[in-house]
Amino acid sequence: MSPVFPMLTVLTMFYYMCLRRRARTATRGEIMNSHRTVESNSRTSPLNAEVVQYAKEVVDFSSHYGSENSMSYTMWNLAGVPNVFPSSGDFTQTAVFRTYGTWWDQCPSAPVPFKRTPANFQSQDYVELAFEQQVYPTAVHVLETYHPGAVIRILACSANPYSPGPPAEVRWETLWSEKPTKVNASQARQFKPCIKQINFPTNLIRLEINSSLLDYYTELDAVVLHGMKDKPMLSLKTSLIDMNDLDEDDYEEKDDCEIDNLNKKFSSTALREGPSNGYFDKLPYELIQLILNHLTLPDLCRLAQTCKLLNQHCCDPLQYIHLNLQPYWAKLNDTSLEFLQARCTLVQWLNLSWTGNRGFISVAGFSRFLKVCGSELVRLELSCSHFLNETCLEIISEMCPNLQDLNLSSCDKLPPQAFSHIAKLCGLKRLVLYRTKVEQTALLSILNFCSDLQHLSLGSCVMIEDYDVTASMIGAKCKKLRTLDLWRCKNITESGIAELASGCPLLEELDLGWCPTLQSSTGCFARLARQLPNLQKLFLTANRSVCDTDIEELASNCTRLRQLDILGTRMVSPASLRKLLESCKDLSLLDVSFCSQIDNRAVLELSASFPKVFIKKSFTQ
């Protein structure tokens, strides 16, 4: 055979994998909606009546707007029958996630995105709901009461959260997914996507959210699961599937690219013998590495099977310096980490967010991985990784001496004593403890030893007893601090704010939303404005006492301001806002929702005068 043919074969396969996504035009939602074999072709006997049920319990979630000790705007509102629907508007009885739009991605605290994230993974938040009865799902309805369109993926799990013993197997299956789309709907809606039929019963449903295209916070009221107790029989009618319908998402599911199959591919040594590598060995090693940098993890796994030369390149640790495993949370397990271990000896950025839950990753498996791969780690993302315990944090503190960035957001099952180990990571520059059970003693120790901190998130940390003491320590020790999240801290006063403002002059971002003990009459907000001239983002959400004096101080001293949230104040007038907008030329987001002096007419006038500023004013119908 001519030597040209092996080269053509490998090049064709490589070209196909690299450029395939550009050749697809259909969305995944269109594909699933075009597979009509399931949509209307199941039949049931009278004995197999459809079960319709609301969620019994909220099992897990990644974030919410509300407090840990309240029901207002929390994910727990998704349990049970609707509270608001069919009304629309901003209601406290709904479930609301912490962010919307791209505003948080534009802040100084926003982390750099991971490269090589698959284009089909765009989920930002999730919530998992348990239902009373296991059924074979026929429909999932989501009641959206404000700014709909955030749900982009619905999954079902084989595990029964109410089963007394651990499940023999845990499987997640995607029922429906779609790319983020802009929904122009001003009224509440019942979102009823056409779902795929699965071959196991479920009472655990997961919604994944992307709010990047929303104009304001999405609000969800309830979720309804329709299904059959017995497995429905498909009719003989089948559908013909156009090959053009197979987009990348579908291709990855049908072509054995799930992470469990990738494990086998990575460990395979049964590669073809001989020099048939398509003459890739004629290219410089560095050039091949540069080309492979554009491939996702599944693509690397596929390419590794073509020949020994490309297998060597695909297994080179240089390909895994930045490793994002979050998109594969549904399949990633101890075996996955074991197979990746030899390739991750140089890993510097590692994202394990959302992974390992329900026994997928063990403490032993995580520890083995870090003992081999932790020495070069600079950044470690572990948001919502509920397998973590104190041993895991101890291992991190011992095996990751170069760690600068640690995210434990919503790891709410970590015991309070576990956080003391973080104090050993003296080089930390970013620490996210949002919705964790960190206590004051451990936090003060962390602040004492981690004096290089630049970004600190303590939002919704309800176990911290005295935020004034915490703020004083931050001001004394963290002189390099640039961003601080104190969202819903329960007891900080003007004393803590004074220590903070005088000790952290470099602050560019400060979130004091829903901090009820701060009063403008003490001068705390005016002091912030005078002492923090570099502020770009300031959230004073739901502080009723913010007044014109505070706004005028911001206008005079914080001309770099980009985002300001003063939702809920009664004391701010349109005149002071106009001064602010005239002084702060970079201002792009201004939330004046429920500000009693700022009516719709004032918003329209200010928007007309300052068209580059997004002025938000929420409403309740």
From Swiss-Prot:
A matching Pfam family: F-box-like
CDD domains, per the entry: F-box_FBXL4 (cd22117)
Segments annotated as LRR repeats: 376-397, 402-421, 427-448, 452-474, 480-501, 504-524, 532-558, 559-583, 584-609
Mitochondrion recorded as keyword: yes
Localisation: Cytoplasm; Nucleus; Mitochondrion outer membrane
GO cellular component, one term: mitochondrial outer membrane
Keyword Repeat part of the UniProt annotation: yes
UniProt entry keywords in alphabetical sequence: Cytoplasm, Leucine-rich repeat, Membrane, Methylation, Mitochondrion, Mitochondrion outer membrane, Nucleus, Repeat, Ubl conjugation pathway
Domain F-box positions: 277-332
InterPro entries named in the record: F-box-like_dom_sf, F-box_dom, Leu-rich_rpt_Cys-con_subtyp, LRR_dom_sf
Asymmetric dimethylarginine, modified sites: 28
SUBUNIT field: Part of a SCF (SKP1-CUL1-F-box) protein ligase complex. Interacts with FAF2 and VCP. Interacts with PPTC7; this interaction promotes destruction of BNIP3 and NIX and mitophagy suppression.
Function: Substrate-recognition component of the mitochondria-localized SCF-FBXL4 ubiquitin E3 ligase complex that plays a role in the restriction of mitophagy by controlling the degradation of BNIP3 and NIX mitophagy receptors. Also rescues mitochondrial injury through reverting hyperactivation of DRP1-mediated mitochondrial fission.
Protein's UniProt name: F-box/LRR-repeat protein 4
Gene: FBXL4
